[in-house]
UniProtKB/Swiss-Prot annotation:
Protein source organism: Nitrobacter hamburgensis (strain DSM 10229 / NCIMB 13809 / X14)
Stretches for region Disordered: 18-49
Role played: One of the primary rRNA binding proteins, it binds directly to 16S rRNA where it nucleates assembly of the body of the 30S subunit.
A single BP term in Gene Ontology: translation
Annotated PROSITE patterns: RIBOSOMAL_S4, S4
Keyword vocabulary terms for this entry: Ribonucleoprotein, Ribosomal protein, RNA-binding, rRNA-binding
Matching InterPro entries: Ribosomal_uS4 (IPR022801), Ribosomal_uS4_bac-type (IPR005709), Ribosomal_uS4_CS (IPR018079), Ribosomal_uS4_N (IPR001912), S4_RNA-bd (IPR002942), S4_RNA-bd_sf (IPR036986)
Protein name per its UniProtKB record: Small ribosomal subunit protein uS4
Domain (S4 RNA-binding) ranges: 94-157
GO terms, molecular function: rRNA binding; structural constituent of ribosome
PANTHER family to which the protein is assigned, alphabetical: 30S 40S RIBOSOMAL PROTEIN, SMALL RIBOSOMAL SUBUNIT PROTEIN US4M
Assembly behavior: Part of the 30S ribosomal subunit. Contacts protein S5. The interaction surface between S4 and S5 is involved in control of translational fidelity.
Length: 205
């Protein structure tokens, strides 16, 4: 198992959930945390513990976004009109790495970040190598020509474990996608329950 996979699956083990719905997740076989004390029965979490866990799970899902970056997204969410929890999800789903993953150009969130860093992705015809780049409705995303036949891309296109959500219009023949609309929480195909309202409560303490 690569170091990248070890880090990814460590998140699953720590949460005790298969947060991406991957067939090879270790929690499909055992539902306890990593380490020698992982099998101990966990007591009931406090409100703070529940809120913290919700934050860790959402951060982990989006390829372990740093606390600094995640908090900045939260602050932006609170400044937008409407429900802050919904806004938080909308902003996370507008990230280029998220959309590259949702469009099934790569197999994992972690791979999306690396794929973009290595210059394989264009937005509106221009190469973008910033995973956190914030997309607008109508933006066109494309795998650059030299990368369209990479095994990583072709294998991701065929993944049966997840579908492209309807807020992204993907064409795997051309390896292009369009960001159609900003999704609500209910639109996002999370494999496990996410609770952004608890994250709002956590930061509002």
């Amino acid at each position: 198992m690569t170091k990248r996979n070890e880090a990814k699956y460590k998140i699953d083990r720590r949460m005790g959930q298969n947060i991406w719905g991957r067939p090879k997740s270790p929690v499909n076989k055992r539902e306890y945390g990593p380490g020698q004390h992982g099998q101990r029965r966990k007591g009931k979490l406090s409100d703070f513990g529940t809120q913290l866990r919700a934050k860790q799970k959402l951060k982990g899902y989006y390829a372990n976004i740093s606390e600094r970056q995640f908090y900045a997204i939260y602050v932006e969410a609170t400044r937008l009109k409407g429900d802050s929890g919904e806004n938080l999800i909308g902003l996370l789903e507008r990230r280029l790495d998220t959309v590259v993953y949702r469009a099934k150009f790569v197999p994992t969130m972690f791979a999306a970040r690396q794929f973009i860093n290595h210059g394989h992705v264009k937005v509106n015809g221009r190469r973008v190598n910033i995973p956190s780049y914030k997309l607008k409705v109508g933006d066109a995303i494309e795998v650059k020509d030299a990368s369209k036949q990479l095994a990583l891309v072709l294998e991701a296109n065929q993944l049966a474990e997840r579908d492209v959500p309807d807020f992204i219009d993907a064409d795997h023949n051309k390896q292009t996608a369009k960001f159609v609309r900003i999704p609500h929480l209910a639109d996002v195909p999370f494999a496990v329950q996410m609770e952004p309202h608890l994250i709002v409560e956590f930061y509002s303490r």
